[in-house]
Each structure stands twice: as C-alpha cells, then as structure tokens.
C-alpha cells in the first residue's frame, strides 16, 4: 500500500507539479487513511470500503478534526483513487458520495483598513532584513498572494515597470497580478540591498546566506511584524484575506476578486461577501437613527 502512495505522490510532484505545501497536505491526509487501513487489517487499497472509511471520518471528527479538514482529506483520497483507477490498481472509490460532518464555516480573520495602514506605515530601517520584510508585507497585501506563491517567486516573475507580478498558484496555474505603488517602492528598496546576500539562484526573497526563504521563516517574520506594530500575532494569509475583503468592499466586483485570488470556484470567494456584510451592518448600527440604542435603553 505504501508503494501505491509513494507512486501517487511522485505523480503529483512530477506530472501535476503541485507545490510542496500541497504535496505535504496530501501526504499527511493519506497517511491517516493508510494507518486506519492497517488497524483494520487491510493490505490493499482495493479492500477499503465506504463503511470502513465512514468509521475513520467519524473517529477523526470525535477527535476534534474540523469539517473543513475532513473535507480536504476526502478530496485527497478521491484524487488518490482516481489515480489508482487509471492505473488499474482498484475498481472502486470508497470516498465517492461521502461528505464530512457539517460544521460552521468560520469567517477568515482580517485587519481593517486602518490597522493595515498602521502595520505597513511603521518606521522601516534602511537595512537588509527590514527592507526585505517590508517588501514582503507590502506584496502580500498589494497582490493578495498565498504564502507558497510569495516564497516561490523568482526575480524574472517581477515587472516593476509594468507594475505586474506573475505567480503560480494551486495546480501550477499562472496568473498576472497588479502591484500597487507602495509595494513597488518597497520592492525597489529591497532589490537595492538583495545582492548583499550573494543569492545562489533567482529567488526574490532570500536570507543573509543567499538561500530562498522557507514558508516557516516568512510566517515568523510576519508574526514578528504584527507584534511589533499592532501588538497581535499575524499570519500571511490574514493579509491575503484583508486584501480580498478591502477590495470587495470598495469594488463590489466578486468575479474580479475571484480572478485576483486565483480561486477556481467563486463559492470560495463568496465567503468575503459575509465579511463585507459584517462591515455594512456595523456601519448601519452606528449610523442609522432607528438602529442606535439610546444610552438609557436597558431593555
């Protein structure tokens, strides 16, 4: 069974050219299913049936796994079985028709526009690390990049004269994104210092040793910036969420936001309409004469 898993992961890496982040997710999810099969005494993927798979999903749900993580596991398993079916390794997909337990969909956390400006307008020293980190923060928010997209950027994907950056998202799909003027300024300042590290390749964001930054290193730098400027922990995806929410709030163009984020399904983008409604509801509560509570209203 492990040989089939390894062959599938090689297929994803070499044929589908998925990102390392996506590959690691498939590996973790499928390892859980593999361990369950071993507990059930199964020695082939063709022996896994829907009943056994339901027991696994129920057990993981009771252990606290979210509906979203279980949906991702089932999606990974369906992809794996499509591969096995094509290779003639089995004749059925036990995950077909199975759905994870329903759960509330959490709204993504965002910064409001003022807090975002406070983060990005903090004092920046003219040194290697500070300029690099500022460029990363500006680019995350300016173009709504995923963490994996920013880490994977090379110099030749950047066209500052045209104000564009080409990123490769999920499924290695390329999209060209605009870069705002503040982000362009920050990138130019960073590029003036980047050569100090003597980079070994064309990676846009590197450490002092010249090597491409890892996702973990970028997460740490964003978190430290959040604590320093805002007194709170930040994650790179929070800047992507803020980009989407602020853009939708200003433009009301859901399709454009979908294209910029690289979402295959507009339903994924629609989560930001709930954030926009929250903003409008807050404005209504503060401004509408029939919505404001009187100070002496204790009912």
From Swiss-Prot:
Subcellular location: Cytoplasm
Keyword check for Lipid biosynthesis: no
GO BP annotations, alphabetical order: cell division; chromosome segregation; DNA transposition
Keywords: Cell cycle, Cell division, Chromosome partition, Cytoplasm, DNA integration, DNA recombination, DNA-binding
Domain Core-binding (CB): residue ranges: 1-85
Principal subcellular localisation of the protein: cytoplasm
UniProt-annotated catalytic positions: 146, 170, 237, 240, 263, 272
Highest rank taxon of the organism: Bacteria
One GO CC term on file: cytoplasm
Limits of the Tyr recombinase domain: 106-285
One GO MF term: DNA binding
Subunit structure, as described in the record: Forms a cyclic heterotetrameric complex composed of two molecules of XerC and two molecules of XerD.
Family: Belongs to the 'phage' integrase family. XerC subfamily.
Its job: Site-specific tyrosine recombinase, which acts by catalyzing the cutting and rejoining of the recombining DNA molecules. The XerC-XerD complex is essential to convert dimers of the bacterial chromosome into monomers to permit their segregation at cell division. It also contributes to the segregational stability of plasmids.
Name of the protein described by the UniProt record: Tyrosine recombinase XerC
